Amino acid sequence: MSYLKKFGQVIGIDISSDAVKFCRDSGHKYTMCASAEKLPIKDEEFSLITMLDVLEHIEDDMQVLHELARICKPNGIILLTVPAYRFLWGDIDEICKHKRRYTASELCARLRAAGLHIERVSYMNALLLPVTWLSRRWKAMTGKNKPLKSPFEKKYPAWLSHI
């Protein structure tokens, strides 16, 4: 959120009151607790919306995309990141309570169905795809799958929030 402040007023929204409290304690006073499925925001309010690794957690992703379309100004930008490819589904998806992974074509179809115009779609970390796939296959074949713990259980140093 700190980085985005140079572009204008930043409002953070999270369904978790703990996350909102963390942001407020970190100096981000414009934060609110709300569900992405029904945002307490007027139509066409934002020129830039970021939703980074959130959509895959929500049961009704279409409702959320319609909400984003509603609160985004005409010619505004919505920046989304989501995990890719169902065949990469793994323990981390279960731990993080993901509902799905997307292909670019699946995500584009949903965005268009919500009335959004797509400027650009790409896969991040595409070079790591073969390594990730091979690693997961190897662990599954050799039985070396170690049970993962939630990354949210660990306490991280405060300075990491400023990177």
Task: List where the protein language model places each region.
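Short acidic/glycine-rich loop or secondary-structure boundary segments that cap or lie
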Residues: 88-90, 127-130
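Conserved SAM-binding loop
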Residues: 1-90, 103-108
